[in-house]
């Protein structure tokens, strides 16, 4: 009957009639696409046909990556072409890594930097940098900037009453009078020594360096007698030992004028 001849069987029936084994997978490359056809059994133990279509794209990869793709394969993939084989290789999705840093350590480092920023203030343009690094240093801007005249401070009501007796200079200050054990009348326990200073260091730069840490009573910048340049070290006497310890903690190892400062406690001199 002609009607029966026109009926065609399905591909699954043809595969079952040919043999009980699965046919090998096939690949067809045309029009920039690769069609991969393979056969397998599903969970119901039935033969199914899986067709995958890939779009072929050309990418510029490093030479080492291209060389690695041409390595000789082994095992079940010994006769495969370059690239992953879906029967032996499972290509998963790309996983992007995100490195999370410790926020507490970053916050500690930021706090340390902020404390140093508060120290640096230019006396020329009042910027957040040292005066020796100011771009306006030595220009007309510095020469034309007027220095404010400090207002007269009223006399303190707690000033000592003049008795008419002679008081030595070493005993006129109330703080120095309490240091009767020191023959020179000075307190070296609040003094620090700053070394590794540049030759261009001045008294104004030294005062700017330490004035925001705490009040000080005396400063000494060692200078060469012939050239007048800084010898590289200075002494600062603070009014409190706590401010001196803070200065050592903040300034020791700090960069100033392209040099690393070395700040330590001043060693007391032996009285002569």
From Swiss-Prot:
Q: Which subcellular locations apply to this protein? A: Cytoplasm
Key word NADP present in the record?
no
Q: By what name is this protein known?
A: Eukaryotic translation initiation factor 3 subunit G
Q: Which SUPFAM superfamilies match?
A: RNA-binding domain, RBD
Q: Where is this region: Disordered?
A: 1-28, 143-187
Keyword Cytoplasm, does the record have it? Answer: yes
Stated role:
RNA-binding component of the eukaryotic translation initiation factor 3 (eIF-3) complex, which is involved in protein synthesis of a specialized repertoire of mRNAs and, together with other initiation factors, stimulates binding of mRNA and methionyl-tRNAi to the 40S ribosome. The eIF-3 complex specifically targets and initiates translation of a subset of mRNAs involved in cell proliferation. This subunit can bind 18S rRNA.
Do you know which InterPro entries this protein is assigned to?
eIF3_g, eIF3g_N, eIF3G_RRM, Nucleotide-bd_a/b_plait_sf, RBD_domain_sf, RRM_dom
**Quaternary data:** Component of the eukaryotic translation initiation factor 3 (eIF-3) complex.
Q: Which residues form the RRM domain?
A: 190-268
Q: Which Gene3D superfamilies match?
A: 3.30.70.330
Keywords, in A-Z order: Cytoplasm, Initiation factor, Protein biosynthesis, RNA-binding
Query: What is the scientific name of the source organism?
Result: Culex quinquefasciatus
